């Protein structure tokens, strides 16, 4: 039986990115992991995930949770560096 950690190791996303998807979609981490894995391989998936994280940042700011907003901003920065910066580059 695969654990969450096993599935995370097979996914191209970090746990923070999965957590942001789960927060945005209001689903469990396991569902978010599956969704994120599908999105990251789709044509507009990187952009969709980016927008989810941005939405989460804005929601955290609106409710005054600046520490969480800062954490999500770091998550967004790492996501862009890892996925968007290498988009179109051969592996």
Name each model feature, range by range:
Residues 1-52, 71-91:
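Long, non-catalytic architectural segments outside compact domain cores
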């Amino acid at each position: 039986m695969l654990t969450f950690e096993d599935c995370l190791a097979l996914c191209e996303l970090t746990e923070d990115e999965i957590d942001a998807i789960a927060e945005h979609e209001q689903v469990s981490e396991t569902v978010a992991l599956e969704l994120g894995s599908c999105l990251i391989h789709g044509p507009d998936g990187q952009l969709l995930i980016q927008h989810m994280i941005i939405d989460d940042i804005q929601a955290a700011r609106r409710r005054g949770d600046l520490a969480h907003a800062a954490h999500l901003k770091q998550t967004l920065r790492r996501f862009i560096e890892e996925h968007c910066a290498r988009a179109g580059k051969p592996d």
